[in-house]
């Protein structure tokens, strides 16, 4: 499978299973700690330094932008991605989620900071991601999950902990069907083309550096 040909590619063992497990356990602890602090008045829902339990794209999941461990993975994986795909990349941001039973990721495409997107499996129960390689526009209303009649069913991609799917996030629609497991940890690592129009203006998702919130 060639990224240049298909605009998506799977990299097996992009990180080791040991590193994936550390990140997954860290994500679980972060979710539990943030939930406890919110419920016990130690922080508030508007504090961007804690995770989000009410994120509109996937309600009832735990999500966090720019977590420093995940930003480390954002940088750490660039070399293997460039070697496997031939791409030249600059990092924009990371976004991690701990999914729970019944969660759904609706069909969508990404914003310009996600020219090259990845989903990296950290651990938990298997939950395939679907990607439409045709590049066609089928979403009428993402948040109401309304699509055009006859929208392609997409290709199912299954990832084990440490595996990564790379795809053209602004071009290829991607989604997940309702989650039937208990927990699944994923981190989305986003990049721009190093020689593209957003390389300088959008570096670090317009933040002064990695590891800070917007």
Question: Where in this protein do the model-derived segments appear?
Answer:
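A short coil-to-beta-strand element that immediately follows conserved catalytic motifs
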Residues: 86-95
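Short proline/glycine-enriched turn/loop segments at secondary-structure junctions
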Residues: 176-181
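Generic beta-strand or strand-like secondary-structure segments
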Residues: 76-80, 95, 117
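Short, well-ordered beta-strand micro-motif
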Residues: 10-12, 166, 190
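C-terminal helix/juxtamembrane-tail motif
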Residues: 205-214
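Non-heme Fe(II)/2-oxoglutarate
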Residues: 1-85
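Conserved active-site beta-strand element of glycosyltransferases/polysaccharide synthases
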Residues: 98
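Catalytic core of non-heme Fe(II) oxygenases with the double-stranded beta-helix
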Residues: 101-171, 183-186, 194-206
């Amino acid at each position: 499978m060639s990224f240049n040909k298909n605009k998506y590619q799977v990299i097996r063992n992009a990180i080791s299973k040991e590193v994936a497990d550390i990140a997954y356990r860290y994500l679980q602890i972060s979710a539990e700690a943030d939930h406890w602090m919110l419920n016990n008045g130690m922080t508030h829902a508007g504090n961007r330094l804690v995770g989000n339990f009410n994120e509109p794209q996937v309600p009832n999941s735990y999500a966090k932008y720019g977590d420093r461990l995940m930003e480390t993975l954002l940088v750490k994986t660039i070399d293997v991605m460039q070697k496997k795909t031939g791409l030249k990349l600059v990092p924009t941001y990371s976004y991690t989620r701990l999914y729970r039973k019944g969660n759904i990721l609706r069909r969508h495409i990404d914003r310009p900071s996600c020219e090259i997107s990845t989903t990296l499996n950290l651990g938990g129960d298997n939950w395939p991601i679907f990607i439409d390689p045709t590049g066609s526009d089928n979403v009428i209303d993402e948040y109401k999950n309304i699509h055009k009649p006859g929208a392609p069913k997409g290709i199912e991609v299954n990832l084990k902990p440490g595996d990564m799917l790379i795809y053209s996030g602004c071009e290829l629609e991607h989604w997940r069907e309702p989650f039937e497991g208990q927990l699944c940890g994923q981190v989305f690592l986003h990049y721009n083309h190093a020689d593209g129009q957003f390389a300088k203006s959008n570096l670090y998702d317009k933040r002064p550096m990695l590891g800070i919130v917007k």
